[in-house]
Design a protein with these regions (language model features):
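Fe(II)/2-oxoglutarate oxygenase catalytic core
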Residues: 1-175, 179-214, 220-249
């Protein structure tokens, strides 16, 4: 069996790790019941469907409420809400390390990296690990690990069209976004707009950021943007990567 390598990258220029840890450890979210009574396992058929969608179209959107379970989704939302009330969430930038640039004309969300240190995060990491192994078995992508962060978009926040990884960088290969917003309506804005990978002027899909829905796409190929939100919008982004060793702190 393949040995999992799960090493989230942390960038001290983006978020103070101890602040994020201290904000959620010991909070009420730790006592939430995560028993997966109604949770469906990640099946081979589901992984087949995901791999087929990525190989044929470069992206797909799926409803994961049944597979992740209401308890886990609620716990993750509570965590990001706690972080949003502290200084643990920082304005997101473009680039990494010394190349990090914060340009509010392009991107206005706030983020906090996950470390897998709480029960909800550990449960989520198991789900991501199943995807990593499943995609490797089906698409031979050679994914070594993943990194993930919470994101908060307040009213008026957006993220203009972009790619998650530049061609030839071979770092981020597959992107996944999980949404944590109940009762989200079209009038609330904040949709993920996905563009044709062969024509970035052509919209090929729009994803409403409702709780339990995920969007998965090839990081180097699929342009996308977050439209302006009209109320606070919570999500979680994950990238499956080729490199084994995280960037130095």
């Amino acid at each position: 069996m393949e040995t999992p390598v799960i090493i989230p990258i942390h960038d001290p220029l983006i978020t103070p790790l101890h602040s994020a840890r201290d904000a959620v450890v010991g909070s009420d979210v730790q006592s939430m019941d995560l028993t997966p009574e109604q949770q469906e396992p990640v099946s081979e058929d589901w992984l087949d469907e995901l791999a087929l969608g990525l190989s044929e179209h470069g992206w797909m959107s799926l409803d994961m409420r049944a597979r992740l379970g209401a308890n886990l989704l609620a716990a993750l939302k509570q965590e990001v809400q706690i972080l949003d009330r502290t200084d643990a969430m920082k304005k997101a930038g473009i680039g990494r390390g010394s190349d990090l640039v914060r340009d509010r004309s392009v991107r206005r969300d706030k983020i906090a990296w996950l470390q897998g240190i709480t029960a909800p995060q550990a449960a989520l990491f198991e789900f991501f690990e199943s995807i990593r192994q499943g995609l490797n078995q089906r698409l031979f992508l050679g994914l070594k690990r993943f990194e993930t962060h919470y994101a908060t978009y307040h009213a008026g926040d957006f993220y203009k069209q972009h790619l998650d990884s530049f061609k030839g960088r071979a770092s981020r290969v597959v992107s996944l976004v999980l949404y944590l917003n109940e009762d989200w309506q079209a009038a609330d804005g904040g949709e993920l707009q996905v563009f044709n990978r062969d024509n970035d002027n052509e919209v090929c899909g729009t994803v409403l950021p409702e709780s339990g829905r995920i969007a998965v796409f090839m990081s180097e190929e699929v342009p996308h943007e977050v439209l302006p939100a009209n109320r606070t919008r919570y999500s979680l982004a994950c990238w499956f990567r080729l490199d084994e060793v995280p960037l130095p702190l």
